[in-house]
Amino acid sequence: MLSLGKNGKTSSTLVRNARRSVIMPASRDVRSRKRRARSVTDTKDVLDLDSIDFTNEKEVQFKVNQLKEFTRNLREQIKYTDELKRKHVIEEEETKSVDPEMHDFDSDAGVILSSLNDKVAGPGAEQNLSTLLLSDKADTSLLPERLSERIKDKDLILRCLFDKRNRDFNPIVTELYHSEQRLKGLGIQFIYSKILSKFDKLSFTSLSQLDEMIMESVGNDSSRLNGNLYEHLMLSFSRVTSPSAQGKLEVCGKLRELTERMDATLSKKSFQPTQYMLNACIFAASKAMSWEYMDFFLKKFTSTYDMQPNRKNYTTVISFYTKMEHYKKAWQLFDSLKFLSLEHKPDTKVYNLMLEVCQKEKNYARSLDIFQEMDDLNVTKDLKTYLNAAKSLALSSADNVTSEGKADSLRLMSWKYIHKIHDDPKLSKQLTENPRNNMLLLETMMVLSAYDGDVGFARALYYKYTNALFKAHFYEFKKYHKDTDPVDYIRIWKKSLSAQMFNWLMLSYSKFKKSRLPVLLGYPEGSSLRRSMIYSVDYSGRDSSYENSNIQLPMLPMTELNDAELTINESKALWRFNLEFGGNYDIRELPEGMQTVKDIENIVKCAKTVNEFKLQISQRLLEWKNRYVNHKILNMKSLITFLTIPIRLHEPNEFKLRLQEFTFQAFEFNERVEYQFKKSKTNELESPVLSKDFNTTDSNALVDNGIIPSEFLLYLVSMKHKLATNCAIYEVSMKAAIAFHDYELAMTTWKNRGKFRMTDAFQKLTPGERQQSDATFAQLMVEYFTNEKMYQDALSIILSSLKTVNWQYSMVKSLHRALLAIEDENSAARLLSVVNRKSKIVELEEEIKSLDL
C-alpha cells in the first residue's frame, strides 16, 4: 500500500523498492463456484391460488409452506415498522428542545434525501402488499383527505379504490350522501377538480345523489354553479347505461332538469353552453328513442342558446332518425349538411350511416350514388363503407321488385366489394383488428348466399361460424371452472347458436333450385373463394371443436345438397337441434311435474275460477318455454322462413306438419282450457285418447312409465314449442294454398282468420296495421280464386271489401287479364270501375272546379 508524504506526494523510497508484478487472468477451464442466493418471490405469485392444481398434494403443500413463510416475514416487518415508529416519536420529543434553526435544517435535509430516494426508486416502483397495509395514509392517497375525513368506513375506501384498474366510486358517493357534512364547505372548484373529474362510471342513482349534494353545498343557489360543472354532469348522465326503456327516459328527464337549471344560472352568470352539452343531450335522447326529448333538446340549444350543432351532433341525429325508421328526415338532414359549411361537410362516418339507411330501404340505386359520390368528393372509404355497400346491394337483390330485375348483377357487384376487402391490405388489417367487422363480413356473405339460393356456400359458412363460437364459449367455460365441474353444454350452445345466421341458412334452403348456378361460379375469383370455403369444412365432425361433447351440428356429410328431399330433412333436423339447445332437450318429452292426469287435477283444485286456471297454466307454460325451448331461435321471423321451405320446394304434407306442430290458434287454446276446467270440476276427466296433433311416434315419446297422458295434457305440453298464429302466419298459409292448389287449406285459413280478427291480439293493432293486414289477405284470396279459375268468387271478395280495402290495379292485374281472356267484358268493366274510382275528396274537388262561379 502506498503512503503519502507531508505534501501529499508518494514516498520515493517506497516507489524505488516497489516491484513490478503481472496479474494473470484465470484460465477459462477453471469453473468458479456459483453463489447461493435466496430467490426473491413476488407477492403476486405467493397470493395467486388460481394456478394451483388442488389434486396435486405436493403442489398444495408447497403453496402452504410458501404462505407460512410470507406470513412470518410480514409479521417481522410489522414488528420492525412499529419499532421504527416508536423511535421516531422519541426523536421528535427530543428535537422539540433543539435550536429551531437546526430543526429546520434537518427538515430540509430530510426533504432533499426523500426526493433523492424517490428518484432512485423511480416513478414506476410499485409498493408491495405489506407496505400498503402498513401505510397510515393509504386512504388519503386514494381519496382526498377532506373527503376521507367525512367517510367513517376507511375499509370501504380501500375495497373500492385499491384496484386502480377496476375502481368503483358508487359506494363512496353513497357513503358521502349518508354522511353528516356531505359536500358542505368544499367549494365548487374542489368538487369539480377532485370529485366530478375523478369519479367515473357512476350509476344514475349515484349521479343523482351527487347532483343533490352539489346543490345542497351551494344552498340551492344555481347561480353559484359554472359551465364546466354543468358540462361534466351532462356528459356523465349521458354515459349511464340502463337496460330498461324507463331508465333511459329518466336520464333524459334529468338532463332536461339540468338545462332548465342552467337557464337560471345563465340569467346571473355569463358562459356559453358547449357542443359537448348538446351532444350529451341528443345522445341520451337517441338511446331512449324519444321524439319528445330529441325535439326539446334541439330547440333548446338552437333557439334559446343560439347554438349551431356541429357535424358530430348532426351525425347523432341522423343515427336517431335511422333507428326510428324516419328515413326521409335522415336524407333531408344529410342533404342539408352538404350546403351548411365546410365544417359540416359529411365525412366517412356520415356516409356510412346513409349506406345503412339504404340497407333499410333496400334502395340499391342510392347506395351506388353514395358510393360514387364518395369517389367524386374524395371522401375516404373504410372497411365499414365496403361492408355497408355490399350488404345494401345484397338486401336489394331479395326479389325482382326491389332489384328491378337486376338481382344477379347486384349480387355480383356486392361480391366484388368483398373481394376488394380481401385484396386491399389496409382493409384486411381493419378486418382483423375488430371482431365485429368479421361478423359484418360473414353476415353479408350469408345474405348473398341465402338470396342466391347457394345452399352449399351457406352451409359451410354456418358450420364454420357455429363451430368457432362453440369453441370460444367452451374454452371460456373451462377457463372459469374446474376440470371436475360438469360442462354446461346447454349454456354453451345457447350462446353459440345465432338466430340471425340460422334464419339466413333457412332462407337459403327455401331458395334452393337444383338447376340454378350460383353467382360465385360465374367468374374465376368467385369460384376459387367458394371452392376453398366449401372444402375447408368436414361435416363428419372429425375437425370439430366439440371436445368431449357427443353432440354436433346435424348436417349431412355432403359438400353439396343436390336434392329437395335432402334439403327438407336437413332443415328439419337443424330446426329441432336449435330449439333443443344443441340436442340437450327433447321438445316432445313431458316436463317435470306434468306426467299424469292427476297433475292437471291438482292445478284445477287450486284454482277457484277459470281465469285462475288460465293464469296458472300460462305460468307453467312460461316456465317450460324458458327452460326447455330455445326461444331465441323460435321467433316469428324464423318460423315463417321455416314454413316457407316446404312451400317453395312444393312439399304440401311437410308444410302442414310444420304448421300443426309449431303454431296454435289463440281462440282454440282458450276454448280447450275452459272446457277442461269445467270437465275437471265435474270429475269428468278426458279419457286417455291421443290428440290428432300427435302421431304414433310422438305419443310413444310422451309415454311415462307405460301410462299414456290425457289428450289435454299432450296438447298443453306441446304449447311450449308453439307460437300463436298472427296475420303473417295466415298470409303464409294462403300462399301455401295458392302454391298447392289446396281448397281445404284455403277455406280453413279464411275461416280461422275471421275468428282471429275478433281476438284481442288483432284488436290491439293500430287501425293502419289492421287495414294493411286485411288488404294483404284479401289480395291473396283474390289470387287464390283467380288461380283456381273461380273468377266470380274473386270478384265478390273485391266488391264486398270496398269499405276496408283500397284496391289498386296491381292487386287485381291477374284477375283482369283472366276476365279478358274468357271475354267476360262486363265483369272486367266492373273490376276497372272499382280500381279507377276516386275518393270522395277528389270527387268534391273536381266538382268545385267544374262550377262556373
Curated annotation (Swiss-Prot):
Subcellular location field: Mitochondrion
Coiled coil segments of this chain: none
Miscellaneous section: Involved in mitochondrial-nuclear incompatibility, a major determinant in reproductive isolation between species, through hybrid incompatibility of Ccm1 and its interacting partner 15S rRNA between yeast species.
Major site of localization recorded for this protein: mitochondrion
Pfam families reported for this sequence: PPR
Keyword Secreted included in the entry's annotation: no
Domain of life: Eukaryota
Cysteine disulfide partners in this protein: none
Cellular component terms (Gene Ontology): mitochondrion
InterPro entries: Pentatricopeptide_rpt, TPR-like_helical_dom_sf
Protein name: Mitochondrial 15S rRNA processing factor CCM1
UniProt record similarity statement: Belongs to the CCM1 family.
Biological-process GO terms, alphabetical: mRNA processing; RNA splicing
Function (record text): Regulates mitochondrial small subunit maturation by controlling 15S rRNA 5'-end processing. Localizes to the 5' precursor of the 15S rRNA in a position that is subsequently occupied by mS47 in the mature yeast mtSSU. Uses structure and sequence-specific RNA recognition, binding to a single-stranded region of the precursor and specifically recognizing bases -6 to -1. The exchange of Ccm1 for mS47 is coupled to the irreversible removal of precursor rRNA that is accompanied by conformational changes of the mitoribosomal proteins uS5m and mS26.
Ranges for the PPR repeats: 310-344, 347-381
